[in-house]
Protein backbone atom coordinates (compact mmCIF):
# COMPACT_ATOMS: atom_id res chain seq x y z
CA UNK A 1 0.00 0.00 0.00
CA UNK A 2 1.37 3.41 -0.96
CA UNK A 3 1.39 6.09 1.73
CA UNK A 4 1.84 9.71 0.70
CA UNK A 5 2.31 12.56 3.17
CA UNK A 6 1.40 16.17 2.34
CA UNK A 7 2.39 18.94 4.75
CA UNK A 8 -0.42 21.48 4.61
CA UNK A 9 0.69 23.67 7.50
CA UNK A 10 3.91 23.72 9.51
CA UNK A 11 3.64 27.04 11.34
CA UNK A 12 2.57 27.41 14.97
CA UNK A 13 0.16 29.88 16.59
CA UNK A 14 0.66 32.57 13.94
CA UNK A 15 0.75 31.68 10.21
CA UNK A 16 3.48 33.20 8.05
CA UNK A 17 3.55 34.25 4.39
CA UNK A 18 4.98 30.87 3.47
CA UNK A 19 3.45 28.53 6.07
CA UNK A 20 -0.06 27.88 7.29
CA UNK A 21 -1.17 26.57 10.67
CA UNK A 22 -1.01 22.89 11.58
CA UNK A 23 -2.22 20.32 9.09
CA UNK A 24 -0.88 17.08 7.62
CA UNK A 25 -2.64 14.81 5.14
CA UNK A 26 -1.84 11.10 4.89
CA UNK A 27 -3.09 9.48 1.68
CA UNK A 28 -3.43 5.70 1.98
CA UNK A 29 -5.48 5.20 -1.17
CA UNK A 30 -8.99 4.49 0.07
CA UNK A 31 -8.27 6.45 3.25
CA UNK A 32 -7.34 10.13 3.19
CA UNK A 33 -6.58 11.18 6.73
CA UNK A 34 -6.19 14.76 7.97
CA UNK A 35 -4.17 15.40 11.12
CA UNK A 36 -5.20 18.73 12.67
CA UNK A 37 -7.09 21.46 10.89
CA UNK A 38 -5.56 24.88 11.36
CA UNK A 39 -6.77 28.20 10.02
CA UNK A 40 -7.16 28.42 6.19
CA UNK A 41 -7.07 24.65 5.78
CA UNK A 42 -9.43 24.80 2.78
CA UNK A 43 -6.98 27.09 0.98
CA UNK A 44 -4.05 24.82 1.79
CA UNK A 45 -5.96 21.80 0.49
CA UNK A 46 -6.77 23.65 -2.74
CA UNK A 47 -3.12 24.59 -3.26
CA UNK A 48 -2.17 20.93 -2.73
CA UNK A 49 -4.85 19.76 -5.18
CA UNK A 50 -6.78 17.82 -2.54
CA UNK A 51 -10.60 17.91 -2.58
CA UNK A 52 -12.02 18.23 0.97
CA UNK A 53 -14.84 15.69 0.31
CA UNK A 54 -12.16 13.04 -0.29
CA UNK A 55 -11.08 13.26 3.36
CA UNK A 56 -12.37 10.22 5.28
CA UNK A 57 -11.05 10.87 8.79
CA UNK A 58 -9.84 13.83 10.82
CA UNK A 59 -7.54 13.35 13.81
CA UNK A 60 -7.18 16.34 16.15
CA UNK A 61 -4.18 16.40 18.48
CA UNK A 62 -5.62 18.90 20.98
CA UNK A 63 -8.03 21.79 21.28
CA UNK A 64 -5.73 24.82 20.87
CA UNK A 65 -7.03 27.20 18.22
CA UNK A 66 -4.16 26.88 15.76
CA UNK A 67 -5.04 23.19 15.41
CA UNK A 68 -8.84 23.47 15.01
CA UNK A 69 -9.82 26.91 13.63
CA UNK A 70 -10.09 25.54 10.10
CA UNK A 71 -12.55 22.83 11.06
CA UNK A 72 -15.90 24.70 10.74
CA UNK A 73 -15.19 25.75 7.16
CA UNK A 74 -13.88 22.32 6.20
CA UNK A 75 -17.00 20.60 7.56
CA UNK A 76 -19.25 23.06 5.71
CA UNK A 77 -17.37 22.28 2.50
CA UNK A 78 -17.73 18.52 2.98
CA UNK A 79 -21.42 18.91 3.86
CA UNK A 80 -22.09 20.79 0.61
CA UNK A 81 -19.89 18.83 -1.77
CA UNK A 82 -19.67 15.26 -0.47
CA UNK A 83 -22.09 12.67 -1.85
CA UNK A 84 -22.00 10.67 1.39
CA UNK A 85 -22.02 13.74 3.67
CA UNK A 86 -20.30 11.98 6.54
CA UNK A 87 -16.91 12.00 8.23
CA UNK A 88 -15.13 10.41 11.18
CA UNK A 89 -13.44 12.72 13.71
CA UNK A 90 -11.17 11.69 16.59
CA UNK A 91 -9.67 13.61 19.48
CA UNK A 92 -9.51 14.19 23.20
CA UNK A 93 -12.55 14.46 25.47
CA UNK A 94 -11.85 18.20 25.85
CA UNK A 95 -11.82 18.66 22.09
CA UNK A 96 -15.12 16.77 21.88
CA UNK A 97 -16.72 19.46 24.05
CA UNK A 98 -15.50 22.19 21.70
CA UNK A 99 -16.70 20.19 18.70
CA UNK A 100 -20.22 20.25 20.15
CA UNK A 101 -19.96 24.03 20.44
CA UNK A 102 -18.88 24.20 16.79
CA UNK A 103 -21.95 22.16 15.82
CA UNK A 104 -24.19 24.54 17.74
CA UNK A 105 -22.55 27.81 16.66
CA UNK A 106 -22.39 27.01 12.95
CA UNK A 107 -25.44 24.71 12.75
CA UNK A 108 -23.36 22.01 11.08
CA UNK A 109 -24.78 18.98 12.87
CA UNK A 110 -27.88 18.63 10.69
CA UNK A 111 -25.93 19.11 7.43
CA UNK A 112 -23.44 16.28 7.76
CA UNK A 113 -23.20 12.98 9.63
CA UNK A 114 -20.23 13.42 11.96
CA UNK A 115 -19.15 10.51 14.10
CA UNK A 116 -16.84 11.68 16.90
CA UNK A 117 -14.71 9.22 18.86
CA UNK A 118 -13.07 10.40 22.08
CA UNK A 119 -9.63 8.91 22.70
CA UNK A 120 -9.22 8.29 26.43
CA UNK A 121 -6.28 5.88 26.66
CA UNK A 122 -3.07 4.93 24.91
CA UNK A 123 -2.95 2.22 22.27
CA UNK A 124 -4.84 0.97 19.22
CA UNK A 125 -8.37 2.36 18.97
CA UNK A 126 -9.37 1.41 15.42
CA UNK A 127 -8.72 -1.50 13.06
CA UNK A 128 -10.12 -1.30 9.52
CA UNK A 129 -8.64 -4.58 8.34
CA UNK A 130 -5.89 -3.00 6.23
CA UNK A 131 -4.86 -0.35 8.75
CA UNK A 132 -4.47 0.03 12.50
CA UNK A 133 -4.84 3.42 14.17
CA UNK A 134 -3.39 4.20 17.58
CA UNK A 135 -2.66 7.14 19.86
CA UNK A 136 -0.58 8.13 22.87
CA UNK A 137 -1.00 11.08 25.20
CA UNK A 138 1.85 13.58 25.00
CA UNK A 139 3.15 16.36 27.28
CA UNK A 140 1.68 19.72 26.29
CA UNK A 141 -0.03 21.17 29.36
CA UNK A 142 -3.47 20.22 28.02
CA UNK A 143 -4.62 16.75 26.89
CA UNK A 144 -2.77 16.23 23.61
CA UNK A 145 -2.47 13.17 21.38
CA UNK A 146 0.16 11.83 19.06
CA UNK A 147 -1.19 9.42 16.45
CA UNK A 148 0.15 6.55 14.39
CA UNK A 149 -1.18 4.64 11.40
CA UNK A 150 0.18 1.16 10.80
CA UNK A 151 -0.30 -0.92 7.67
CA UNK A 152 -0.93 -4.58 8.45
CA UNK A 153 1.87 -7.06 7.72
CA UNK A 154 1.22 -9.10 4.56
CA UNK A 155 1.98 -12.64 3.48
CA UNK A 156 3.74 -12.48 0.11
CA UNK A 157 4.79 -15.18 -2.35
CA UNK A 158 8.50 -15.72 -3.00
CA UNK A 159 8.49 -15.32 -6.79
CA UNK A 160 11.81 -17.12 -7.23
CA UNK A 161 10.46 -20.21 -5.46
CA UNK A 162 7.15 -19.87 -7.29
CA UNK A 163 8.98 -19.95 -10.64
CA UNK A 164 11.19 -22.85 -9.56
CA UNK A 165 8.15 -24.93 -8.58
CA UNK A 166 6.28 -23.73 -11.70
CA UNK A 167 3.32 -22.67 -9.59
CA UNK A 168 0.56 -21.02 -11.65
CA UNK A 169 -1.08 -17.77 -10.64
CA UNK A 170 -4.62 -18.07 -9.32
CA UNK A 171 -6.32 -20.14 -6.60
CA UNK A 172 -3.15 -22.00 -5.58
CA UNK A 173 -1.28 -18.77 -4.86
CA UNK A 174 -4.30 -17.36 -3.03
CA UNK A 175 -4.40 -20.41 -0.74
CA UNK A 176 -0.69 -20.17 0.03
CA UNK A 177 -1.04 -16.48 0.87
CA UNK A 178 -3.90 -17.34 3.22
CA UNK A 179 -1.55 -19.68 5.15
CA UNK A 180 -2.85 -22.92 3.67
CA UNK A 181 -0.74 -25.79 2.34
CA UNK A 182 -1.54 -26.99 -1.20
CA UNK A 183 -0.93 -30.01 -3.40
CA UNK A 184 0.39 -29.30 -6.89
CA UNK A 185 1.17 -32.04 -9.42
CA UNK A 186 1.11 -34.64 -6.66
CA UNK A 187 3.52 -32.74 -4.42
CA UNK A 188 2.54 -31.12 -1.13
CA UNK A 189 3.75 -27.54 -0.80
CA UNK A 190 3.77 -25.88 2.62
CA UNK A 191 2.81 -22.23 2.62
CA UNK A 192 5.68 -21.37 4.99
CA UNK A 193 8.20 -22.70 2.46
CA UNK A 194 7.20 -20.37 -0.38
CA UNK A 195 6.09 -17.20 1.41
CA UNK A 196 7.57 -14.38 3.45
CA UNK A 197 6.16 -11.65 5.67
CA UNK A 198 6.32 -8.11 4.35
CA UNK A 199 6.27 -5.71 7.27
CA UNK A 200 3.67 -2.97 6.96
CA UNK A 201 4.59 0.71 6.91
CA UNK A 202 4.01 2.91 9.94
CA UNK A 203 3.51 6.67 10.02
CA UNK A 204 3.54 8.59 13.31
CA UNK A 205 2.34 12.18 13.68
CA UNK A 206 3.64 13.94 16.79
CA UNK A 207 2.91 17.65 16.93
CA UNK A 208 2.87 19.88 20.04
CA UNK A 209 4.75 18.24 22.91
CA UNK A 210 7.68 18.52 25.25
CA UNK A 211 10.18 15.67 25.18
CA UNK A 212 8.49 12.58 26.61
CA UNK A 213 8.65 8.80 26.26
CA UNK A 214 5.30 8.68 24.42
CA UNK A 215 6.74 10.77 21.59
CA UNK A 216 9.44 8.22 20.79
What feature does the model see in each segment?
Residues 1, 50-53, 112, 129-131:
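Structured loop/turn residues at beta-strand edges in well-structured enzyme cores
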Residues 1-48, 84-86, 147-149, 196-206:
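Conserved beta-strand hairpin/beta-sheet module of binuclear metal-dependent hydrolase folds
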Residues 8, 122-127:
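Local beta-strand/beta-hairpin segments that build beta-sheet-rich folds
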Residues 10-11, 39-40, 63, 94, ...:
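Active-site metal-binding loops of divalent metal-dependent hydrolases
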Residues 14, 65-67, 123, 141, ...:
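Active-site environment of divalent metal-dependent phosphoester hydrolases
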Residues 39-90, 115-120:
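Active-site metal-binding motif and surrounding structural segment of the metallo-beta-lactamase
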Residues 94-105, 114-121:
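A gly/proline- and charged-residue-enriched helix-loop-helix capping module
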Residues 131-205, 209-216:
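Active-site-proximal loop/helix segment associated with metal-binding centers of metalloenzymes
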